């Protein structure tokens, strides 16, 4: 059984997943996040954000794929966004490697049409602090007298 490693970073939260074809072709796609099923993702309000790639593409496309995602760092929201992006990117990579190019392109088009951030990472990072002030851009107050 072959596995592929994919990783994704959203601001400070990082999601890594080994992706493997299911041992049985008829098995439903197993998606676990930190050892628990995706249906139990907390907080409940953000659960459907993690489900977006599955709801967009349908369960049938995930049937032959097992995903075990480890996510750490950041807050609840950035972790959920890292999870959803890693699921989408892994499925596209799986279809490119194990299925055909046409199916991969079809999946990619559906995901990009819905939300481009499912496949493209947000490049913004925290700017480092500089001297002469309390933050990256803020300066200490200047007195003339």
UniProtKB/Swiss-Prot annotation:
Q: What is its main location?
A: cytoplasm
Q: Which GO terms describe its cellular component?
A: cytosolic small ribosomal subunit
Localisation: Cytoplasm
Q: Where is the composition biased (Polar residues)?
A: 1-13
Q: List the Pfam families hit by this protein, alphabetically.
A: Ribosomal_S9
**Keywords assigned by UniProt, alphabetized:** Cytoplasm, Ribonucleoprotein, Ribosomal protein
Q: Does the keyword Ribosomal protein apply?
A: yes
One GO molecular-function annotation for this sequence?
structural constituent of ribosome
Sequence segments annotated as region (Disordered): 1-24
Question: What InterPro entries would the database entry show?
Answer: Ribosomal_Su5_D2-typ_SF, Ribosomal_uS9, Ribosomal_uS9_CS, Ribsml_uS5_D2-typ_fold_subgr
Query: Would you kindly state one Gene Ontology biological process term found in this protein's UniProt entry?
Result: translation
The text of the family note is: Belongs to the universal ribosomal protein uS9 family.
Q: Under what name is this protein listed?
A: Small ribosomal subunit protein uS9
Q: Which organism is it from?
A: Lupinus polyphyllus (Large-leaved lupine)
């Amino acid at each position: 059984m072959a596995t592929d490693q994919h990783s994704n970073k959203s601001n400070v939260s990082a999601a890594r997943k080994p992706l493997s074809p299911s041992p049985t072709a008829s098995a439903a796609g197993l998606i676990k996040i930190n050892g628990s099923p995706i249906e139990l993702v907390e907080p409940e309000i953000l659960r459907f954000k993690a489900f977006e790639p599955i709801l967009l593409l349908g369960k049938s496309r995930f049937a032959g794929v097992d995903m075990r995602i480890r996510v750490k760092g950041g807050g609840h929201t950035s972790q959920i966004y890292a999870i959803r992006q890693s699921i989408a990117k892994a499925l596209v990579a799986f279809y490119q490697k194990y299925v055909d190019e046409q199916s991969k392109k079809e999946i990619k088009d559906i995901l990009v049409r819905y939300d481009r951030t499912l496949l493209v990472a947000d490049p913004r990072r925290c700017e480092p602090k500089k001297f002469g002030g309390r933050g990256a851009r803020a300066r200490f107050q200047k007195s003339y007298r």
